[in-house]
Amino acid sequence: MSRTPHSVMIADIGYGNCKTILLTQAPEGIVERRWMIPSVVVQTRENLSSLGSSNIRKIQVGGTDIYFGPDILDELGGTQSGMRGAGSHYFESSTYRNLVIANLCESGLAVIDELVLTLPLDYYETAAKELKALRGQYEWQENGIFKTTTVVNVSVQPQALGALIHYRVLNANVGFEKSTRAVLDFGGGTLNFLVAQGYAGKKLRSGHVDYGVRSMWEDMAKEISRQIQASGRVAKFENVALIENAARSGRDYVSTAFGDFEMASLLKQTHSRLVEKVTEAARKMGDVSDILEIVLCGGGAAYIEPAVREVFPVQKIVCLPEPFFANANGFAMLSRKQMAGRELAHAE
């Protein structure tokens, strides 16, 4: 940054959810806001069940209606949309750009000095240049009122670097730069992993496995189907959104037309599958004997932790607090220092 920013937005837009932290300068100091919305935007009102939630916003971009917000999945009535069905180049999609606009709208600011976007390491190099071009002025209408936000600068960062910064700030251990650890980010669409010595990522030992929390919900739906059919009924359960909503709400059961199914039992059935996917990630890392710690983050961190402990019995397992926001938190910590005119130690 050429000057101290007065506003920084960190947007970690993943397959499943968009996690955003907004930092602004105020007379009393740096003020922080954070929010999380599903990575789903809807352009047709008919796709929504009622649009009765106050947690859904409607804006017009270029004459097209866009609906987004925390309750968008509930209003979709069990259907899925947006980035949850996108491929590896999701950052090139119109949904990604609309989610950027949705977050700018949510900020309520006329100017964002620095927009920090995060990407999985696999796509960071190819997409960084393209996403930096997202700076400029954005226009939309809401409730008939014309609004704009200008993004002065865009920086693109590897997601796992944020988790490493977060880890480093919370664990001021000696020898961080010389020790090797792996970050496992179990997100909505993929299990991303980064092997790094200090902050230096080892590209050939990093990557992803095509299995995320969404895949886990689908495996749980198959288990529900199996239990239904074992009871003598001919039916197939495919409403994955019911499972996701039960998990998001902290409910002990998934309530369906075929009865209630215990979440703990369903999760237990996914364990062998999670072990299989973590083992696949470990195999791609190569010789893991030099890895001192495994740092867990992402919305599915709690689900995958038992499998990680089984696959990595020797390494210390560190679960970052607020795993959904772990990547964004790291860059927010760094941005706070920059906004205050100070550098974060060892975070070059």
Over which residues does each language-model region extend?
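Nucleotide/phosphate-binding catalytic cleft detector across ATP-hydrolyzing
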Residues: M1-R181, A200-V213, A241-E348
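Aromatic-anchored, glycine/proline-accented short structural segments
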Residues: T180-R248
